[in-house]
Amino acid sequence: MYQRSCLTYFCVIYNEDTFDAKDFFESLNLDYKVFERFGTNKSIEIGRNEIFDININEMVRVTLKDLFGKEEILLNLKKKYNLTYYLERVPSLVYDTDEPNQILSLEPDIVEFLYKTQTEDDLDYYIL
């Protein structure tokens, strides 16, 4: 039998030629982390969370905990480096089970954060 699971993270897409990772992390008062680079546009994952909660909002709050209150800084960095932000939500929903599936709708505080930071919501779900 399949198990429910979910992954959430904040994704930053950037161009390596114009992006200063050290400035980005220092501006947000986050520890600089080594990250993998792929393709022309590169990406950073922040707040990766795989600890399942039936309410996806709780998982997202863990993902965004170090970014809440820094919306203006994120927006300024977005403009400075021409960044793209995504909130990635990747749940696995189990078909034909008596257990409830994950609540996927976002609550107002998270929607407000996405709006203020011009972050796109990316929901990729798998049905098992």
Q: Residue spans of the language-model regions?
A:
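Acidic (Asp/Glu-rich) sequence patches and key acidic residues
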Residues: 1-126
